[in-house]
Amino acid sequence: MRLDPFYLIVDSADWVERLVPLGVKLVQLRIKDRPEPVLREEIRRAKAACAAAACQLIINDYWRLAIDEGCDFIHLGQEDLMAADLAAIRRAGLKLGLSTHDPSELETALAAAPDYVALGPVWPTILKEMKWAPQGVERLADWRRRVGPMPLVAIGGITAERAPLVLENGADSAAVVTDITRNPDPEARTRQWLAATAPWRSVG
């Protein structure tokens, strides 16, 4: 399995509908603390927008809803992984991505046989408080050796200018949140990301 080198993460279907038509091919819908009917509607809208643009949609956390709504890819954090029914996820045919922040979490993730692992934060991030220190690009090279051919996602503090650095140091995909969603011109920044990651999109 290959991931697009530009991995957009957003918190609403509005963002999906706004940015995916620009050429985004990999997007995660990460919504927190909303009622189930709202979540279902957000997933349905995001799924429709992604289907229209041939974009891979990944649902964060809500694996039961992802199964119910016919999605095919989910992402779980370490705490969510402990509570999830991996057998049910696999029976439903969903692909699985997992977050990791240290070697112990990587071992836990690899034991679950995911379809990709994410390492972060590579650089300091303003998105949320993190108990882990920034990993740096050096850790990416180490993770690359540990995971073998499995796709590796870098996340945390990545900008369009930094994306080539993580892709050159072992990551298959660079994940971004605030560099786009908090930019004064998210559409222009998305196009900059598409351009910055283009050399890796055409490889292979």
From Swiss-Prot:
SUPFAM superfamilies: Thiamin phosphate synthase (SSF51391). It comes from Rhizobium etli (strain ATCC 51251 / DSM 11541 / JCM 21823 / NBRC 15573 / CFN 42). Gene3D superfamilies: Aldolase class I (3.20.20.70). This is Thiamine-phosphate synthase. Transmembrane segments: none annotated. InterPro entries: Aldolase_TIM, ThiamineP_synth_sf, ThiamineP_synth_TenI, TMP_synthase. 4-amino-2-methyl-5-(diphosphooxymethyl)pyrimidine binds at Q28, L29, R30, I31, K32, N60, S99, K128. It holds the Pfam family TMP-TENI.
